[in-house]
Structures are given as C-alpha cells and as structure tokens.
C-alpha cells in the first residue's frame, strides 16, 4: 500500500512539471558569418561577458546588459503575450531578470524583421508611464513597461509586467534568431523593479514548487527543455548535488577549483561562478582561459574564433570544475564545439575586477553536461549528469 502511495505521489509530481521546449538554432554569430558581416560587426561591437553582470549597481532604473553577449546564444523557446495571444521567440536567460519583446512602437529595421507586440490588438493590455532602457554597443534599446497575459508553456499569467521596445538600433538585433529575452534571475537585478516572470508564477500559485530546471540537449534541433515548478529525473543520472547560492541576484555559487590532469590551473583559493543559460560559452579569467587555449592547441582565426583541429578532440583532457566538494568533469567533446568539419573552443576569456576575486560563467557548454535545478525556495542549485 505504501509503495502504491509513493508511486502515486511520484506520478503526481511528474504531472505538475510544466515543460517548455527549447529549439536549438543558428546563433547570431553564425548568421553574421554566413552573410560575411561578422568582421564589420566586431569593429563596432565588442562582446564582453563582464558587462552583463557588473554595471547594474551604477544604474537604479536602467539596465545596462550588453546585448552583444547574446552573440552565441543558440537555445530559444516560444511564449505568447496578449489576448488573443501573440507569439515570440525568446532566450530563457538565468543571467537577467526582465521580460521584453519588440513592439509596434518600434520602427527600426531590426524590429521590422522580427515579431512585434501590438498592444492595440490585445484586449487585456494595460499600459504604464514607466520606461526601460538596455544599452549595447553604439546605442540602446529603449521601451516602455506594460502589463498583459503572458503564456509560457501551459502556464498562463494574467498580470505580467514586460518591456515593449521602441528603438533597437544597430546590427545586434538585425539578424538575431530571437525576438526578446525572458529573464530568470532574482528580482534584485530587475530593471525598473519589474517583477520577473517566474516570481509572478510563484506568487500567483501557478507552479507547485518554487523552482525550475533546465535540460539542454546536444541534439542539433530538439530535446531541450525549461521545466517550471518541478524536476523530471528522467533527464539526469545519479543524484542531484546541491550548491548554496552565494549571491541572490544572479545564480551565483562558490567554486572550489578548476583543474586539468589533477593540477589546479585556476580558482586555486576558491572563486565565484555564475550559472547562466543566456551565455553560450564557458567564460573565465583571460589569463586562465588563455593558458587552457594554449594547452589544448587552440588559436585565433581572422574572425576571432579559437579554432582547433577536430582530430585532436579524442586526445584532449577533461577540464574539472570542483564545486561544493564534488568534481564536475567537462570532456573535450563538450568544450570543443564541432560544426561540420570545423571545430572551435567553447571557452572565452574576460577580465572582471570584483571584491570576490576571479569570476567564471558556466554557460551552455557546462549546462549541456549537467542538468541544472534553480531552487528559489532554498536558494540553491542542483547539478547532476545529464542524459
């Protein structure tokens, strides 16, 4: 009888996980390469992962996320806004907290080439006088805030605040394979104090657990998911290892060390790391990343990519990240990105001056290997080997 009850509870827990499929598409970088525009783009837009995380203390109501940092984003999902629903392709980004999409208020070419939310076509839209601005490159995305029904998978939130863009200058969005961004970080870093989507889901009782989880498939097109309100154990092996969040803004944790072949190569006295679905690559201090690139034989090409011979993958060592006493090895098949006959390093350097010392960003390169649970109720991350 007890076993029947347990099985019933397990079945119930699976039923209340709201799964949102993600599709893997060509990144903005790949689109620009195909059109022969990447070199021109990089002359005026310099991707710097650090700018996504540290200018926010300077601006109380203006978000200063550098949108060039979505240059390599590949995983996208569909949401709808309004009544009747208007569909948008977005990045589910654990490294930011705002939801915004292009709108009919925007007349720039970048907006014209993407889906635009039309508030006049929604019977449930409520406007505000509040503004939103996100700076990037040579200009900024400016917009206004409004409320409407937002549907994410099977979850319908009837009172969600979001940004409607009015200007989107430059090439950053012209060829972007997404319309907007849905932030899943903590509300403390939300621009204009806008309540993040997941916080609203929980506050309104739309999910049964105050957590969400992410599975990123290595499949070229399908299989990836964001799961709201629960955990599906069929997407990982072994047990989840829990890591306390060290800063309740980003999904930031303390990492013990980074090693190769048993030798510590970085983060010798522990360091901070941010687990970020909105960052495609694995990012660390420039000196440490440069040493790793040299070790694995990667060298920059004319487009600034760190290329490597595909034949070397089988002979390269694991990069081991030790977190909360548990080792998380990253094999070369994970940190070397292969497309057709070309191979590039999935590692990227950045310099950040923080009071906590060196900082690493564990992006999609890491998350593809490790199923990740973002547990807001207990302010912790769960990690387990992905299937």
UniProtKB/Swiss-Prot annotation:
Gene Ontology MF terms in the entry: aspartic-type endopeptidase activity
Record InterPro entries: Aspartic_peptidase_A1 (IPR001461), Aspartic_peptidase_AS (IPR001969), Aspartic_peptidase_N (IPR012848), Pepsin_A (IPR034162), PEPTIDASE_A1 (IPR033121), Peptidase_aspartic_dom_sf (IPR021109)
Keywords: Aspartyl protease, Digestion, Disulfide bond, Hydrolase, Phosphoprotein, Protease, Secreted, Signal, Zymogen
Annotated propeptide span(s): 16-59
Modified residues (Phosphoserine): 129
Cellular component GO terms held in the UniProt record: extracellular region
Residues in Peptidase A1 domain copies: 75-384
Leader peptide range in chain numbering: 1-15
Superkingdom per UniProt: Eukaryota
Biological role stated in the UniProt entry: Shows particularly broad specificity; although bonds involving phenylalanine and leucine are preferred, many others are also cleaved to some extent.
Name of the featured protein: Pepsin II-4
């Amino acid at each position: 009888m007890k076993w029947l009850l347990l099985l019933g509870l397990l079945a119930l827990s699976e039923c209340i996980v709201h799964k949102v499929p993600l599709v893997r598409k060509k990144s903005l970088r790949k689109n620009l390469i195909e059109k022969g525009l990447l070199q021109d783009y990089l002359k005026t837009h310099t991707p710097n992962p650090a700018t996504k995380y540290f200018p926010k203390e300077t601006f109380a109501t203006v978000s200063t996320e550098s949108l060039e940092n979505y240059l390599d984003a590949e995983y996208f999902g569909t949401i709808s806004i309004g009544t009747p629903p208007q569909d948008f392709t977005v990045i589910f980004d654990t490294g930011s907290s705002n939801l915004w999409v292009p709108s009919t208020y925007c007349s720039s070419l970048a907006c014209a080439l993407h889906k635009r939310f039309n508030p006049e076509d929604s019977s449930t839209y409520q406007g505000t006088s509040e503004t939103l601005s996100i700076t990037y490159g040579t200009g900024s995305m400016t917009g206004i805030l409004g409320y409407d029904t937002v549907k994410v998978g099977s979850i319908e939130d009837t009172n969600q605040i979001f940004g409607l863009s009015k200007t989107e200058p430059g090439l950053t969005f012209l060829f972007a394979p997404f319309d907007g961004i849905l932030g899943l970080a903590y509300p403390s870093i939300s621009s204009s104090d806008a309540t993040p989507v997941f916080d609203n889901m929980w506050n309104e009782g739309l999910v049964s657990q105050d957590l969400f989880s992410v599975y990123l498939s290595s499949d070229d097109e399908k299989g990836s998911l964001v799961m709201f309100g629960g955990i599906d154990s069929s997407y990982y092996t072994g047990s989840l290892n829990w890591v306390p969040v060290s800063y309740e803004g980003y999904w930031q944790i303390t990492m013990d060390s980074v090693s190769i072949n048993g030798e510590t190569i970085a983060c010798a006295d522990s360091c901070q790391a941010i687990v970020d679905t909105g960052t495609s690559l694995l990012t660390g201090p420039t000196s440490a990343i440069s040493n790793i690139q040299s070790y694995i034989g990667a060298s920059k090409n004319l487009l600034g990519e760190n290329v490597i011979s595909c034949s070397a993958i089988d002979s390269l060592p694991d990069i081991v990240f030790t977190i909360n006493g548990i080792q998380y090895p990253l094999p070369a098949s994970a940190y070397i990105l292969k497309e057709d006959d070309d191979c590039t390093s999935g590692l990227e350097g950045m310099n950040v001056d923080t009071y906590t010392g060196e900082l690493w960003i564990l992006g999609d390169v890491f998350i593809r290997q490790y199923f990740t649970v973002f547990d807001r109720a207990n302010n912790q991350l769960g990690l387990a080997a992905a299937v």
